[in-house]
Amino acid sequence: MRHHHTLTPQSPGTTDGSARRLDSHLTGPQTDTSTRFHIYFDNKGSLTTSPFAQLDVDDVTSFGPEITTINRFTPGIYRYSVHHYNGTSTIIASPARVELTLNGVTRIFTPPATSTTLGIESVWVVLELTVDSAGGITVTPVNTYTTALTDAVARVVKGSGKPPLMGGNW
């Protein structure tokens, strides 16, 4: 399963700088503990050891793509988000899109056109993958925004790596 996060300009040759840096974030269950992993630019993961997921491509100089691959699933909930780390506009106005390729089928997600009041530090919570004990995978679009990438947004309890105990739509 390859989980692709692809960023492309609105039209070829157009790069207005509105979304200079969009970073992908994947969280999910660890295979060997009750904690959760968090893959992003500073913690790229591994395909050969737990969490069996990795940020393969992290484009820091242009408009993507960023590619995250999950090599082996552990039962639980995986969450994929895009953080608008740097730029002069909002993630909604950016040319961002997420491509999820699962079992040979590609689904494309684009930022929902809602409030444009979120600033540079806004986060697009794109989707969740729920993996059952038999290996079945359910894709659930989340398509919400928040103003910061907090532990609750990443589905972990601060400092513990564990899912939140209560609250929100977690």
Language-model regions, residue ranges each:
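Intrinsic-disorder/low-complexity signal
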Residues: M1-W170
